[in-house]
């Protein structure tokens, strides 16, 4: 069972978590959004989903409670549970200037429209520094979950805002497994102490959690390889493999499990360990 999280919680002298009020199987307790800094204007990391008035109320309450305003908005990646609240924030939380909303570009590049186009993204790059009173954030390009995903290193705390690259509970989904594994290895090199994840509770041993994620994916890959090694003459569909490998996963997570399996299969095919055939549905078998 997911740990209970307060809707507004001060996590450190410079980090306040405001829960997105959008709980679900994919979002856990909801999206974690963060106010970062110590001054009268702070950085907001992520924005939750569109049309969640409870979140806007919580964010207003947090701004009032800590006597602060939003300096700018950083979006860790394009998914709607992280970028979807931008329009509602701009519409319902007054600011003395137009909100500056920053993120990494999609890769390959594509046009991104916020709402009906009143706001536009300001694109930032890997290694950029974003500063506010009491906090310095360094942009870390961490593709894999999405092609535009970024984590942010809070230098004053040696802490990482991990977006959906690493979650406080369970594991995440990804678009490209090779990119994702490289991003995990890059985050490991940072040697951070703490992770503030995009969903779930704070992670207080960053290195152990990242190593756990890397080990989990390597173990999953080994499970898949073992199935093919033990059945050299047979071919398997994604759903057949899911029944063998994700035996205890509840039905509402079957789609996510199959998505992750498919990405493992693509990586193994790229590595030359298996090949795919159409029969008539796509299946895979071991490369002899």
Curated annotation (Swiss-Prot):
Belongs to the metallo-beta-lactamase superfamily. Glyoxalase II family. Its EC number is 3.1.27.-. Zn(2+) 2 binds at residues 81-82, 118, 164, 199. Binds 2 Zn(2+) ions per subunit. The gene is Lactb2. Its cofactor is Zn(2+). Keywords: Acetylation, Endonuclease, Hydrolase, Metal-binding, Mitochondrion, Nuclease, Phosphoprotein, RNA-binding, Zinc. This is Endoribonuclease LACTB2. Endoribonuclease; cleaves preferentially 3' to purine-pyrimidine dinucleotide motifs in single-stranded RNA. The cleavage product contains a free 3' -OH group. Has no activity with double-stranded RNA or DNA. Required for normal mitochondrial function and cell viability. Zn(2+) 1 binds at residues 77, 79, 118, 145, 164. Monomer. The modification N6-succinyllysine is found at residue 273. GO terms for cellular component: mitochondrial matrix.
